[in-house]
Amino acid sequence: MSYVGRKPTDAPLTSADIADGIIANADIASDAAIAASKLSGVVTPSYTGDVDITGEMLADSYNESLATITSSSNAATLDLESANVFTHTLTEDVTYTFSNPPATGTAYGFTLKVVQDSTERAITWPSSVDWVAATAPTLSTGSGEVDVFTFFTHDGGTTYYGFVAGQVLS
């Protein structure tokens, strides 16, 4: 008995009922589960929102989202919902703002790559950044020199733990 094109009312959907190999969201109950043994090959999910995984997740590789930051009127915002790796070539002294951190209880880390232009630029960090020994690092000053910083929060952005990942890189 085939239910392709309509939902079954008196029998479960089986693989034989799926003619095109695609199950639409409307065909799946919100509390449905698929056994891992039933998944094989490459699975390409299409979704929006969070994906919660119970147990271990293994990946051969993964990609992080990259955003290029620009500043205006000596200010730049890192929107933490948009990426988790940011790059910024300084064109002026800048004050950073970190916006849209995940809620308290969700751990989140991000990386910021800063490139000096031909003029020695300065950064003012958010007061919520807790640096090692409570001292913000001194920036590299040479034209084209790169500094990389990593940050971590788990309290909704009340505190960001800041670390130098590398300095005077090129």
Regions inferred by a protein language model and the residue ranges of each:
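Fibrous stalk/shaft segments of extracellular and virion attachment machinery
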Residues: 1-65
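Short solvent-exposed loop/turn micro-motifs enriched in small/polar/acidic residues
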Residues: 44, 71, 143-146
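Predominantly extracellular/luminal regions of secreted and cell-surface proteins
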Residues: 55-82
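A generic structural signal for well-ordered coil/turn residues at beta-strand boundaries
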Residues: 47, 53, 82, 145-147
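Short, surface-exposed loop/turn motifs at beta-strand boundaries within globular domains
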Residues: 11, 21, 81, 103-107
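Short secondary-structure boundary/capping segments within folded domains
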Residues: 49, 76-78, 99-104
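Acidic, glycine/polar-enriched metal-coordinating patches/loops
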Residues: 89-170
